[in-house]
Amino acid sequence: NVKEDEGTITGHIGRSLSDRLQMAVFEDGSEGKHAVTHYKVLQRFGYVTVVSCKLETGRTHQIRVHMKYLGHPLFNDERYGGDKILKGTTFTKYKQFIINCFKACPRHALHAKSLGFTHPKTGEQHRYESVLPEDMQEVIRKFDSYTSAVEPHKDEEE
């Protein structure tokens, strides 16, 4: 769950010293290259948050690494810990719901809505747009339905 509604993550990204398959943030700049990601929360579903990210730099796994750094790994991202229930209840019903969501979207939930670049020879701007894939839309619908059913009862627990 991302705490702030929007913000900027700045930190050097380089190969993790403990796991060569992962990248990591190095706050002190001792490793890696400078990386900047701006994020904005689009929707909240309890402990799951839909976030939009805009990159100033293009480092390997930048969004995945910066979101993990915030304590919000990408949904179902097994490399960076998003395939585990990190927060919230561990009751069987909730666990089964999450497992069903993992099955509905059997990959990390990262989608490039738009990509753009300047052609190196012509200087022409290129921009490509893409809609959110159906499996990710399905998971969002599931969370919307689940949290709508659970939220009215939240006050009764407190």
State what each model feature region is.
Residues N1-E158:
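RNA pseudouridine synthases
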